[in-house]
Amino acid sequence: MLKTPLYESHIAANAKMIDFSGWSMPINYGSQIQEHNNVREDCGIFDVSHMLAVDIQGSEAEKFLRYLLANDVAKLQENKAQYGCMLNHDAGIVDDLITYKVTDEHFRIVVNAGNRESDVAWFNQNAQNFDVAITPQTDLAIVAVQGPKAVAVIKRVVTKEIAAEIEALLPFSFKFFSKWMVARTGYTGEDGFEVILPATQVKKFWDSLLENGAQPAGLGARDTLRLEAGMHLYGADMDTSTTPLERGLGWSVDLSDEHRDFIGKKAYLAKKAQGVDTKWVGVVLKTKGVLRAGQEIDFDNGEKGYITSGSFSPTLKVAIGLAYVPKQADNPVVNIRGKELEVELVKPKFVKNGKSLI
């Protein structure tokens, strides 16, 4: 199994390790709920070095990414980041990712751990007609520093000058400090940063964060946090069999420049014209029980919906899920252990900055 540069730190902290996409990763350090609540109320840190930063450089870097991605990087200013999907020719989602614009000729993309090899292969396969160099940065580590006190913690571990610049970063902005890249992004619905830095320096950084008030958090808390925030998990909520239209991600597909072609555009426009017969929703179970991926949602007209992600919400203290359901259907119920339980359909976003949205 693959190990991140912080593997020994996780073992020393008595983390429970699991196999995640071939990587030995911490699921928790004792209490997933405590780790979750700490990110909502204070500051938690995550090792996400199993994800991969890929640099796209060259005179046609922007031109290439305008073709590769469904969102339009031409809209990006330097030191800004953009969420988007990478589609195949059928408009199926190959991955969802964040693109960072360093300069007109240098972009950085962070890809999901389970798609590292396939994404890089897809980049290379589609880059042949462009003047670009694609460089997977395998010698970098990534640490997410998340929570309302993330700024306070990170300020304690860097110089005053750097602290001021980090604090001034706006959401979806980033800055390089030598080989370190600090972005005001995250996967929790809280304020925070993702720090991409040389693997040789990550242990010292991790330890100093812990010494200055941060608590480690595992992938278990990361999953419940992102679910509460209504953020998609690739491989669970969407994959190559789904288009952005069916998963509430149409907003991330930029069609404003009709002259721009991108992979999957033709199929996407056809699907858009045809219309989709499902909608992307949040699900709340008000009674006792747990919502899980794969569960059916039954409606009184005989139609069905399906939950793609589900869990107990530590913040709301109820079971929540993300699901696709028929556009027109009433009285949704889920079947749990032979009992039909009523669920409420809500907007697919439950918590932001520690506050309930439902």
Curated annotation (Swiss-Prot):
EC supergroup of this enzyme: transferase
EC number(s) per entry: 2.1.2.10
GO cellular component annotations of the record: cytosol; glycine cleavage complex
A molecular function GO annotation: transaminase activity
Keyword Transferase attributed: yes
Superkingdom classification of source: Bacteria
Pfam families recorded: GCV_T, GCV_T_C
InterPro entries, sorted: GCS_T (IPR006223), GCS_T_bac (IPR022903), GCST_C (IPR013977), GCV_T_N (IPR006222), GcvT/YgfZ/DmdA (IPR028896), GcvT/YgfZ_C (IPR029043), TrmE/GcvT_dom1 (IPR027266)
GO biological process: one example: glycine decarboxylation via glycine cleavage system
Alphabetic keyword roster: Aminotransferase, Transferase
Catalytic activity: N(6)-[(R)-S(8)-aminomethyldihydrolipoyl]-L-lysyl-[protein] + (6S)-5,6,7,8-tetrahydrofolate = N(6)-[(R)-dihydrolipoyl]-L-lysyl-[protein] + (6R)-5,10-methylene-5,6,7,8-tetrahydrofolate + NH4(+)
NCBIfam families: gcvT, PRK00389.1
Subunit structure: The glycine cleavage system is composed of four proteins: P, T, L and H.
HAMAP family linked to this entry: GcvT
Family to which the UniProt record says this protein belongs: Belongs to the GcvT family.
Function: The glycine cleavage system catalyzes the degradation of glycine.
Protein's recorded name: Aminomethyltransferase
